[in-house]
C-alpha cells in the first residue's frame, strides 16, 4: 500500500533526518537503532552494502570503502579546488573518468566499482525512505528534500536526481534555513505581529544565513547568504591536524597520517572531543595502539580548540553582515536570532553571534538537529493537499541565492535575475547581434556576483541559429529566464522577426547526469536494494539454522528429555547437530538456498525422533502437547514444528546474537 502524503527529508552532509505530518503535528521518525538522525554514510564490504549507523560503526575497519560527505561532492566538478582539498582528508578514493565529474571508487563484493555522488546520496535518501516506511507501514513515493540555501543550480538539480534514483518523486527542493524557519514560526503564526528573524544554520558541512520576515503565516525571505563548504567537519579537520602533530612530537617524528585506519580512529575521537568541549572546559583523547602499537593520550582545552578554529568561527559573521546589507536592515531591527545545526552548540560560535547582535539572547527553542526535517515535513504535508488549522494560510516566499545572467560582448556578465529575488520568477530582456549578417547567437548562462563571466560559474550554453542576414544591432533576440520554486532555471531565446526559438532547462551540461545515466542508476539502485534484501534473508536463514541446531542440542542434553531417548536416537541427533554447526562455521557466506537445504536435512533427522518421543510421553504429535513447549527451553515450543518446516517461529523468537551491536 502506498502512503498518500509525502515525507520531509533533511539530507545532511554528516547526518540526515526524516519527518512526517501525523495527528496534527510533525513526527520526527527514529531509525532501527532508535536514533532520530542517521549518519549520511554508505559502506561497501565483501558481502553487503551498509547505510547509516551500521556503515559508520565499521568505518575504522573499512575506511577506504566507507563513503561519507557525498554532499560536498554533489553538483561539483572534479577540478573544483574545494574537491581537490577535500580529497586530502578522505580515506576513500575520488577519481574522474575524463569528463571532470567526480566519481567515488570502492571495492564491493570483490570488484572495483565507481559511484556518482548522486548515487551515494540516493542510498542515504533510500535509507530515510525505509525509516519512514517502517514507521508508516506503507510504501512512500513522494518527498520534500532540503538543500543549503546557498547551493547553486547544479547542486540543486543533482540533489533532485538523487531523489529520483532512490525511487522518490521530489515534490520540492527547499532551502534548509527556510525549513527551519517554518519549524520556528509555525506556532507563532497567529501572534499577528511582524517579526524579523535571522536563521543561523551551521551544520556538519555547510553554513547558511537567512533573514526573513514572518507575518502571520507568511514567511518572506529577504536575503540569504552562506558558505556551502563550512561546518563541523572543518573543525574536526583542525583537531585531527593538531593531534597528528602532537603524536609526531611525542613519538620521535612518527607520522600517523599515512595510516588510514589510525587517521579514522583519531577523527572519531576528535569528533567526540569537540562535542565534549561544548559542555566541558577540556576533553581527553585516549586511543589504544593508535599507530605502530603506540597508545595515544592527549588533552585539549576549550580555549585551545577556539584558537585552532578561530578564523573559521569568525568567518561565520561575514555572511551575517552580507544578508543585513542585502536586505537593507539594521541589525537592531532583528527580533530573533535562531540557531540551527549541530555546530551552533559550540559556545564560541554562540558568543560571537550574540556579541555581533549587541549581546542579544539567542533563540534555542527549536532542536538544532531536527528543525530542518520538521520544516520539510510541514511543506510536504501542504504540497500534498494536507489541511490543518496550524498550516492554513502558510505561504513560503523564498529567494534566488545567486545572480543569474548571460555573457554579452567582451565577457561581461549581464544580470537578468538579481540575487535575493523572490522565486518563482520570470525575467526577459532584449539583446541583439554583435556583427553584421550574424547567422546565430551562442547564449551562455552564468551564475555569480562578479562583473566578468570568467569569475562566475557557467551553468549551460545553447545556440539560436537561423537569424536572417541583417546589420549588427538590428535583430531582436528576447532572452527569458524562468526560475521555478525549486530554484532550478530554464532559459529560452526567441528571435522576434522570425519567431525562431530555442530553450534549455539548465542541466549544467558538463556536470549533470543525462536521462540515460539516471535511468541506469535507478535500475542499479533497485538491483542493490534487492541484493540487500537477499542478504538479510540469508542472514535470517543462517540464524534460523543456528538457533534450531542449538535448541536441539539443549533439548537432548536436558535431563528431563535425555532419559526418554534411546542411545541410537540421541547419537543420531548429536551427530546431525554437530555436523550442521561445523558446516555453519565453515560457510559463513552461504546462499539462502544452502541454509534452507541444511535446515531441512537437520529437521529430517531430528523431527521424527522428537515426534516419536512426544508420542511416547503422551503429548499428542505436535509441539503444543506439553505446557510451555518442550522442557529443553526450545524457543516457542518446537521450532520447525513438524512438517511445516521452520517458518518464523524459531527464526524470529528471542534476540539474535548476531544482531546485537
Swiss-Prot record:
CDD domains: ASKHA_NBD_HSP70_HSPA1. Transmembrane segments: none annotated. Residues 637-648 have a biased composition (Gly residues). Residues 637-661 are annotated as: Disordered. Disulfide bonds: none annotated. GO terms for biological process: response to heat. The keyword Repeat does not apply. Keywords: ATP-binding, Nucleotide-binding, Stress response. It holds the Pfam family HSP70. GO terms for molecular function: ATP binding; ATP hydrolysis activity; ATP-dependent protein folding chaperone. GO terms for cellular component: glycosome. It comes from the Eukaryota. Belongs to the heat shock protein 70 family. This is Heat shock 70 kDa protein 4. It comes from Trypanosoma brucei brucei.
